[in-house]
């Protein structure tokens, strides 16, 4: 065994062994229970960053731990390979996106292998491969034929820099999530998936996802945004049309003092032709962001249309305004404004001097101060005709019944969630498999013509997709009538590819179907790991897609991910690592200098997985020193020859104490990892154990036997975290099978039993001493020993003992006055 810890040689040896033995190649025919552990696959940017390393280290540690527990583990890896950065890189470097992407995949694959991650590389996939996205196209056509896909002209979020449409979730404070450009509003034809058909199930099933963080579930609940209310109509005076609105507060109906129209409402657009103030609002809406946080804080601006609506219950005439805080895509683009009971309505009314009429008063009789702001709570109705005096909940039902009886409204459920617009005006994405015929309209590409393959040898110059200028791609014949037709040149939103990749990993070599029975064997994913920033993007879409796959008979489970771990960010100097801040750390440089095990150990030791990790150069150096010390402990032990068999009955008190420390460490690590995945505290326990082993200068046969057991325990606990060194040390400790095949250690309950315990002694809750007693000592014995302590006597002398609190094995507290 080498005198010095040589991580480069040790890691190369272990990685070669795993590859030669196909150690991590999962097989479905195992009699062991399955465990599917998956970390969100990366975009192939070319180099791993520390966020990647943390994410994938957590996943690998969980996978290796579960393997030691006897599970048949699947841990695959692939590439979320489509997307805008490849096009941007192509423009900067003059390299086609396909070539740039595949070169990056090769580089990152080698980095991942160098970190020792136990992936089943036989299942590797890249979403830019036609054999992957052909099945996405196939499913899209099936959903089109079922009516779950439709095309519509819609107001969309247009990113003027990236020249593409963004989903609402991709607009962050009015700016594009990638480019940072101010988003504009445009009307263009789009393909949509009817995710709203699944809104109820997506919402209700969240209650069953008890393996998910509550924060993520709440984010999805809020995004789906189910609300019960009443849809009602206001006639427009002098016009043969109505304004339809949805309200969750019909109890405030008598407080309506104006109507609000979105700038993009058809009536607003009509009036804008002759009304400059309205035209200005329309233009502002088309060029401004639509994020709700943006709208909530934006200055309230509007224009009086001169139109009046007629109140459905009182007949009162109500002015109609165009208001910049009303969104066209939510509901009908019109709202009934109740400024006394809605803060945005109040701010607008205050700006323009519109009436503010309170009709709901606090139930406790508190005075309303409408001058200070809206009262938005429930309460008791006033000035509401026959409904005055009713509590809000009763008034909700009574007013809804009245509106329904008079044919002016009906109760309904509304969602904040909107259908998923999946069209992108970009090149580097999966082609949408539709053909546009002048006579037949949109026609799906026949199954036997799939995949519609993306041409890869292109030049990217910016200003839209090159597909639009490639007749060889878009010119085709209509599958129905044979006439000249054109292919769709939009490509899929890249979230389409990441919405089902987890299932494809189960059968990545299947070329005759989207999925086969292996997908049912492995899904749902038992442990999914990734960033919380994907809570309402990828994670919601993946849940929807999985339910679609279920309804198509391709999987039988209802949800894709049983447990979700959202890892914390990697920080340096208190802020997230990023190139723009110049505070990044290159993991490859650390691997080259210290070895992969050191990087893995620091990553798992510095913080619990779900909390932010603060980068520390000294922490990395400390991790390296610990591994060097562990290597030295094993080296020195092995140099003395094979250790004899352990006889627990033949141990001295000192040896028994050390053995107890070994098994306490096993028990703690098993509890920390098994229940909470807090590997950092398990590592700390192993470090303490190694300190104790290092201090044990005992060359006797029994002493060496305890040392052998202790070193084996340390190696087994660390094996998922620092697998290369533990692979090496396990063989050095005399084993012929690799540590990766060894079971997780179990604590010997007999070894944990203590003959004596040290009790903390308190007087009136303050520490006054310690006493050592037999482990089975009762309260009477503990009290006698405590009161016999000299320091305790000082604090109880001349006082009456009122009570004694005894916690067996831990403390005794004497209450004296």
Swiss-Prot record:
Which chemical reaction does it catalyze?
A: tRNA(Leu) + L-leucine + ATP = L-leucyl-tRNA(Leu) + AMP + diphosphate
Intervals of motif 'HIGH' region: 42-52
Q: What is its EC number?
A: 6.1.1.4
Q: Which CDD domains match?
A: Anticodon_Ia_Leu_BEm, LeuRS_core
Among the GO biological process terms of this entry, one is: leucyl-tRNA aminoacylation
Q: Name one GO molecular function term.
A: leucine-tRNA ligase activity
Keywords for the protein's UniProt record, in alphabetical order: Aminoacyl-tRNA synthetase, ATP-binding, Cytoplasm, Ligase, Nucleotide-binding, Protein biosynthesis
Main localization category: cytoplasm
Q: Which residues bind ATP?
A: 579
Entry-linked Gene3D superfamilies = 3.10.20.590, HUPs, Isoleucyl-tRNA Synthetase, Domain 1, Valyl/Leucyl/Isoleucyl-tRNA synthetase, editing domain
**Record-linked InterPro entries:** aa-tRNA-synth_I_CS, aa-tRNA-synth_Ia, Leu-tRNA-ligase, Leu_tRNA-synth_edit, M/V/L/I-tRNA-synth_anticd-bd, Methionyl/Leucyl_tRNA_Synth, Rossmann-like_a/b/a_fold, tRNAsynth_Ia_anticodon-bd
**What Gene Ontology terms describe where this protein resides (cellular component)?**
cytosol
Q: Does the keyword Ribosomal protein apply?
A: no
Q: Where in the cell is it found?
A: Cytoplasm
Residue ranges of the motif 'KMSKS' region: 576-580
Q: Does the keyword Transferase apply?
A: no
Q: Can you tell me which family this protein belongs to?
A: Belongs to the class-I aminoacyl-tRNA synthetase family.
NCBIfam families membership: leuS_bact (TIGR00396)
Per its record, how is this protein called by name?
A: Leucine--tRNA ligase
């Amino acid at each position: 065994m080498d005198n010095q810890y040589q991580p480069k040689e040790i890691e190369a040896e272990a990685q070669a062994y795993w590859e030669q033995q196909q150690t991590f190649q999962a097989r479905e025919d195992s009699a062991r229970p399955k465990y599917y552990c998956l970390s969100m696959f990366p975009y192939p940017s070319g180099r791993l960053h520390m966020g990647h390393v943390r994410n994938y280290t957590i996943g690998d540690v969980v996978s290796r731990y579960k393997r030691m527990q006897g599970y048949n583990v699947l841990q695959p890896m692939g590439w979320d390979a489509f997307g805008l950065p490849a096009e941007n890189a192509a423009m900067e470097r003059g390299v086609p996106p396909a070539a740039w992407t595949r070169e990056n995949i090769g580089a990152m694959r080698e980095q991942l292998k160098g970190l020792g991650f136990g992936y089943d590389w036989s299942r590797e996939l890249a979403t830019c491969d036609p054999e992957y996205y052909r099945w996405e196209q196939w499913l899209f056509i099936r959903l089109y034929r079922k009516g779950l896909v439709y095309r519509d002209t819609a107001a969309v979020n247009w990113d003027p820099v990236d020249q593409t449409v963004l989903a609402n979730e991709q607009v962050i404070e009015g700016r594009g999530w990638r480019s940072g450009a101010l988003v504009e509003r445009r009307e263009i034809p789009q393909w949509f998936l009817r995710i709203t058909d699944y809104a109820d199930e997506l919402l209700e099933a969240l209650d069953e996802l008890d393996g998910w963080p509550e924060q993520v579930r709440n984010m999805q609940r809020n995004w789906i945004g189910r609300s019960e209310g009443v849809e009602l109509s206001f006639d427009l005076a002098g016009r043969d049309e109505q304004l339809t609105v949805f309200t969750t507060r019909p109890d405030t109906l008598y407080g309506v003092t104006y109507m609000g129209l979105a700038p993009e409402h058809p009536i607003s657009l009509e009036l804008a032709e002759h009304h400059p103030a309205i035209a200005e609002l329309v233009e502002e809406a088309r060029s401004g962001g639509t994020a709700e946080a943006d709208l909530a804080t934006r200055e309230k601006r509007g224009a009086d249309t001169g139109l009046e609506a007629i109140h459905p219950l009182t007949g009162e005439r109500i002015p109609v305004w165009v208001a910049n805080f009303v969104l066209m895509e939510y509901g009908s683009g019109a709202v009934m404004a109740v400024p006394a009971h809605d803060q945005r309505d109040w701010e607008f009314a205050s700006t323009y001097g519109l009436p503010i009429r309170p009709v709901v008063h606090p139930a406790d009789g508190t005075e309303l101060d409408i001058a200070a702001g809206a009262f938005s709570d429930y309460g008791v109705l006033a000035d509401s005709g026959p409904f005055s005096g009713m509590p809000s909940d009763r008034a909700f039902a009574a007013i809804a019944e009245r509106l329904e009886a008079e044919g002016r409204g009906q109760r309904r459920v509304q969602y904040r969630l909107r259908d998923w617009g999946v069209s992108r005006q970009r090149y580097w994405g999966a082609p949408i498999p539709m053909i546009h015929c002048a006579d037949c309209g949109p026609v799906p590409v026949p199954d036997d013509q799939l995949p519609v393959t993306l041409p890869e040898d292109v030049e990217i110059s910016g200003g839209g997709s090159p597909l639009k200028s490639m007749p060889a791609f878009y010119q085709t014949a209509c599958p129905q009538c044979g006439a000249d037709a054109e292919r769709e040149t939009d490509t899929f939103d890249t979230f389409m590819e990441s919405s089902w990749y987890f299932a494809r990993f189960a059968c990545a070599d299947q070329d005759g179907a989207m999925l086969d029975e292996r997908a049912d064997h492995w899904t749902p994913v038992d442990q999914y790991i990734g960033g919380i920033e994907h809570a309402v993007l990828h994670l919601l879409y993946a849940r929807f897609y999985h339910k679609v796959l279920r309804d198509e008979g391709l999987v039988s489970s209802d949800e894709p991910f049983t447990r979700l771990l959202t890892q914390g960010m990697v920080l340096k100097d208190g802020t997230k690592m990023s190139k723009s801040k110049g505070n990044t750390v290159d993991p490859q440089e650390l691997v080259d200098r210290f070895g992969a095990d050191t990087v893995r150990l620091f990553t798992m030791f510095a913080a619990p997985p779900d909390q932010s990790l603060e980068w520390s150069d000294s922490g990395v150096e400390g991790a390296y020193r610990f591994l060097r010390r562990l290597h030295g402990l094993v080296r020195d032990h092995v140099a003395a020859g094979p250790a004899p068999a352990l006889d627990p009955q033949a141990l001295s008190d000192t040896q028994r104490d050390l053995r107890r420390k070994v098994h306490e460490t096993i028990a703690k690590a098993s509890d920390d990892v098994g229940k909470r995945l807090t590997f950092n505290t398990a590592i700390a326990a192993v470090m303490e154990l190694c300190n104790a082993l290092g201090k044990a200068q005992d060359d006797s046969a029994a002493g060496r036997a305890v040392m052998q057991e202790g070193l084996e325990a340390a190696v087994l606990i660390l094996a998922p975290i620092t697998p290369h060194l533990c692979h090496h040390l396990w063989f050095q400790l005399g084993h012929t099978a690799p540590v990766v095949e060894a079971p997780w250690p179990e604590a010997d309950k007999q070894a944990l039993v203590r003959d004596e315990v040290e009790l903390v002694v308190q007087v009136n809750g303050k520490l006054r001493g310690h006493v050592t007693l037999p482990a089975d000592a009762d309260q009477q014995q503990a009290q006698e020993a405590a009161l016999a302590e000299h320091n305790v006597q000082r604090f109880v002398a001349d006082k009456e003992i009122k009570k004694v609190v005894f916690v067996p094995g831990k403390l005794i507290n004497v209450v004296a006055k």
